[in-house]
Amino acid sequence: MQVELTVNGQQRSDEVEPRLLLVHYLREVCGLRAANVGCDTTSCGACTVLLNGTSVKSCTVLTVQAAGQQVTTAEGLAPDGELHPVQAAFRQEHGLQCGFCTPGMVMATVGLLSENPHPTEAEVREGLEGNFCRCTGYHNIVRAVLAAAATAAAGAPATEAPAAGADGTSGADRTAGADRTTGTAAGERAEVGA
């Protein structure tokens, strides 16, 4: 079945199986790796993307259902090496560790902040209930969301990808943190069940 949609600002037209999930379309057809497959049962949120600006779990959406719509992945938030304010906040507040859940958390946060630009800590926790992280304990993730909201409220621009040594960490460590927020980390993790 032919499907036309916009992915990260680029118009696409592809032949797909009618039952192909959006997460698999993004990864296998588009080559975008940020949306991760963690459960395939809508439980973990690692596959979260924006569909017409609303965060959705892409393992629950058939690609044909997204026809004619706009899909944004974590890669689409960071054009030209600049981090989106949410991605920058996740890096700055250490709201990531292994990075598997991070792109989904980032996209859920972008969706949350578009609906509620000034959330309380309780509203952040409630808004991210559908996204699991096995590493961080959520404290730094919540701090990152609140920092992103404050940055957006102040009208601050996105930041460039990190330079080496500015905060005492190595350039490799800082770049890895930025890469995890954009879903482009070099050491891609294996998919659960793959």
Ranges and model annotations:
Residues 1-194:
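Signature of N-terminal electron-transfer/Fe-S-associated modules in redox systems
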